[in-house]
Design a protein with these regions (language model features):
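Small-molecule kinase domains that catalyze NTP-dependent phosphoryl transfer to phosphate-bearing small molecules
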Residues: 1-8, 69-115
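Alpha-helical structural signal in soluble globular domains
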Residues: 9, 33-41, 92, 115, ...
Length: 127
């Protein structure tokens, strides 16, 4: 289970260090677990970075990427999964007063990075 592995890894982190999780949680039940684990450890989730782009932009970029699993049907499934799983996840974090940093993913990679840094700084997360 991902949660068990994550708990083991987090236990080895120096307390003064920050941890960035990429791609976890992906479901509300995982988010609820993470919120509980953070609270139990006396920590907090300091911010969520949500990078968004219009579906047509994402579709075009994924098709250009050329990975074997980047087929239109598979990509459309990912869009449905986003609506079903990720949007409720963001709503859960918002109800728990976790800052959600909205980033425009349609920009260049360097502009996205700059916007993430600015958002984290504005949220009080030192990077």
């Amino acid at each position: 289970m991902v949660e068990n592995i994550l708990m083991q890894e987090l236990a080895s982190v120096v307390p003064s260090c920050k941890v960035v999780l990429d791609g976890f949680p992906r479901r509300v039940v995982q988010a609820a677990w993470l919120l509980g684990a953070a609270k139990e450890a006396g920590d907090a989730i300091e911010a969520i970075v949500h990078i968004s782009a219009h579906e047509n932009v994402v579709l075009e970029r994924l098709l250009q990427r050329g990975r074997p699993d980047d087929k239109p049907d598979a990509i459309n499934e990912r869009f449905l999964e986003y609506e079903k799983d990720i949007k409720p996840l963001l709503q859960l974090f918002a109800t728990k007063d976790v800052p959600i940093i909205e980033v425009n993913g349609e920009q260049s990679p360097s502009a996205v990075q700059a916007e993430i840094r600015l958002g984290l700084t504005d949220a009080g997360v030192v990077i």
